[in-house]
Every structure is written in structure tokens, then in C-alpha cells.
Amino acid sequence: EVRRFPAKGEMIFGLYNNSLSQSVYNTFFGAIQSSGTFTEGRQDLDKVYETSSFASDNTDVRFSSFYRQNGQTFTFQRLVNNESEIKNAPLQGLTLIRLPEMYYILAESLYDKDKAGALAALNAVRTSRGLKALTADDAKLLSRESFEKELMAERMREMPGEGQVFLAMKHFN
């Protein structure tokens, strides 16, 4: 299994690595147990995932798939939840590119000449994740700058823990 939400049919290209689960566990969980080291995650997840706008017809399923809330803190559970998963449900590799990334690339390339096409590409990902589609008059889409900001936010929601956000920051800045 390559754990990338929702994985089924979305991975275009990836790399096989049968020891990934153990490596992730050793790095993030083993060190915590043996040394008492604590790795603090993002404190702004409610803002990143816009949880204040969640409703029965508008809930980003990535949020509950990637994080578990424990009081005021969040546990990142996307790659490995616990030690038993290393044997029972190990990660088998890394995704290098997948369908949502292709939609983001398409949306960015279309924005200047075909805003409706750019919006459709972005909404293809958003609606597949349980969110309502954005409309053409949404403030997030009115300028190139606000559109790029929304694409960046989408990458943050879609690809936590992968290093992709750093590359996007280099690209957009």
C-alpha cells in the first residue's frame, strides 16, 4: 500500500520501498519513546483545512484521514499510526506524482486564458475530497495572486508530510 489519500487509482508514478514503514516509525515514533523527544506538528490545521466551514455537505475528508485530534494537539497519522501497522499494513512505497498534482498543474496553466477551465480542474480535486465546488465569483479566484494562494493551500491540504509544499513555495515565490 502506498498511503496517499485516497490512493485508489490516483498514483501516476511512484517508487517501491518495502522498509518505509519501519523507517518512518523509527524516525518519528521510536525516537520519541526512547528519548522523550516530542515533535510538534502544525498548530494552524483548523485554518489550513478551513474547519470552520465544515458542514454535512462540505467536509474535507483529508483532515480526518491525515490527523487525529487529541485535545488541543493533532497527531499526524497519514504514514504510520502505530507500531502494529509496520507488520499489518506496511507502506510499500512513495508517490512521486498523482492525479491531484496534475489537476493543480493544469489549473495553474489555464488560469490566465481559461478561468473556467482552471476552476474546473481545481474543483475536480476539491469535490473528490468532500468539499463544495468553488464558484467563479469566489474571492479565492478573482486575481492570479489569490488563485495561486488557493493552489498553495490546496497543496498544503493534499500533501502534508511529503516535502511538496516546500517545492511549491519555491515555485510561487
What are these regions (language model features)?
Residues 1-30, 40, 53-173:
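Acidic/polar-rich alpha-helix caps and helix-coil junctions
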